[in-house]
UniProtKB/Swiss-Prot annotation:
GO process terms (BP): negative regulation of epidermal growth factor receptor signaling pathway; ovulation; phosphatidylinositol dephosphorylation
EC number: 3.1.3.56
Keywords assigned by UniProt, alphabetized: Hydrolase
Family to which this protein belongs: Belongs to the inositol 1,4,5-trisphosphate 5-phosphatase type I family.
Alphabetical list of SMART domains matching this protein: IPPc
Organism: Caenorhabditis elegans
Pfam families recorded: Exo_endo_phos2 (PF22669)
Superkingdom classification of source: Eukaryota
Single GO MF descriptor: inositol-1,3,4,5-tetrakisphosphate 5-phosphatase activity
Official protein name in the record: Probable type I inositol 1,4,5-trisphosphate 5-phosphatase
Catalytic activity: 1D-myo-inositol 1,4,5-trisphosphate + H2O = 1D-myo-inositol 1,4-bisphosphate + phosphate; 1D-myo-inositol 1,3,4,5-tetrakisphosphate + H2O = 1D-myo-inositol 1,3,4-trisphosphate + phosphate
Length: 409
């Protein structure tokens, strides 16, 4: 029997010039690995190098080495991390595979060039450049025409294939498109971004199917899938008995937590949306309806392009079970399965180490970080005492909490 541990972690907040989160993040991951004690451990990373990747990508090999040192039980490491930010196909994705010596003789790695499995020899291999042509990895950035209206980003996927005790595993790291604007979900098509995520993941699944090489692998897709809540049902839940008020561009307001009260005399409201609504509206406010003049403009929720300010953000986090049903994007992928989610949203957590147990007021809470699998994999995992959870709740891991799935086969 082999104990497996799969982790996905968006590490975009980890890479800053001061590297202040490195030590706590490494300890948080190492503690989870120690508690599970797997023989085969894979961690998928997104946004390696962070937002300041030209400055901070040099930190990536350092943190890989430090994590490896913190996991002395593993004798073999295969690390594939795309930090070649000057390359056209740059994705900032990473896959780190740690294997115990006791499993070496029962593990082989697929060579996508020769289409053959090869035994593992060298104990440590770290590759950070030239992954497009590296034989043990498939890495692609999503085609530019997937989203022609915005700047071509670094979203894409990375695949490794392994044979472990005669079972074939495909581990796929995917980073799907995010929600560019909170307002677009109200002004335009509420499924605007989820439809593009579906297109991207369907593309990945089709590519994987074409490269199965005569087998049906146990497929695990785990990464920052950027799944978001159904905006209509979630907003209806939060804003019951409120009225929606678009706010003109020049209107500037602070946080609702600071006691925001909108003044009817100073507020310019567009009551008849038109063709130029996106251009003229900077925010949408949901205000309580009341017969009292003092409270009729009381703001429950204010939404801007990159702001989601609920009047009681702590309650929003504490009551996460009340909106679990609004997490529906997995329904778009009938061939993929997931263990039951019983953990809080994984995004957007505070990036401040002094205030790490709160959500930022940038986006609606969401379960962005997921582990999906095909039916064959799901059937085996179900019988293997699975545990599916997020972790790092007491420490700052950046704006995403890592998610893990452990099981035995």
């Amino acid at each position: 029997m082999v104990q497996y541990l799969l982790i996905t972690a968006n590490v975009g907040s980890l890479f800053e010039p001061d590297a202040r989160l490195h030590t706590s993040w490494i300890k948080t991951v190492a503690d989870q690995v120690e508690s599970v004690d797997p023989s085969f451990f894979v961690i998928h990373l997104q946004e390696t190098g962070g937002k300041k990747f030209t400055e901070c990508s040099q930190q990536v090999p350092i943190i890989i080495n430090r994590l490896s040192t913190a996991l002395p039980k593993f004798d073999l490491l295969r690390a594939y991390v795309d930090i070649d930010y000057e390359a056209i196909e740059y994705t900032a994705l990473g896959a780190l595979c740690f294997i115990k010596r006791s499993l070496w003789s029962n593990v082989s790695q697929f060579n996508f060039h020769t289409k053959k499995y090869e035994q593992l020899t060298s104990p440590k291999e770290v590759v950070t450049h030239g992954l497009e042509n590296y034989p043990y990895v498939v890495k692609h950035k999503f085609p530019k025409d997937f989203w022609p209206s915005i700047k071509w980003g670094r979203k894409g996927y990375m695949q490794t294939r392994w044979k472990i005790e005669n079972k074939v595993f495909d581990f796929v790291n995917a980073h799907l498109f995010h929600d560019e604007s909170n307002l677009a979900l109200i002004h335009e098509n509420p499924q605007l971004y989820s439809q593009n995520r579906k297109r991207a993941l369907d593309f990945v699944l089709a590519e994987l199917s074409s490269k199965e090489n005569g087998c049906t692998p146990l497929l695990f897709v785990f990464g920052d899938l950027n799944f978001r809540l159904d905006s209509r049902s979630f907003l209806n839940r939060l804003t019951e008995r409120t009225a929606q008020h678009p706010v003109a561009d020049q209107e500037q307001m602070g946080s609702l937590a600071d006691g925001l009260q909108a003044s009817a005399a100073n507020l310019q409201v567009i009551t008849h949306p038109s063709e130029n609504l996106r251009r003229t509206v900077s925010a949408i406010e949901f205000r309580r309806e009341s017969d009292s003049d003092d409270s009729q403009n009381s703001c429950v929720l204010r939404i801007e392009k990159k702001k989601f300010d609920y009047f009681n953000h702590k309650k929003l986090l504490d009551d996460w079970r009340s909106y679990r049903d609004d997490d529906k994007e997995t329904e778009n992928f009938q061939s993929m399965f997931e263990m039951h989610i019983n953990f809080p949203p994984t995004y957007p957590w505070s990036e401040d180490p002094e205030n790490s147990e709160t959500l930022m007021k940038t986006r609606a809470p969401a379960w962005c970080d997921r582990v999906l699998m095909n039916k064959n994999a799901y059937s085996l995992v179900e019988e293997g005492e699975p545990q599916y959870r997020s972790f790092g709740m007491e420490t700052c891991t950046g704006d995403h909490k890592p998610v893990m799935l452990t099981f035995n086969i």
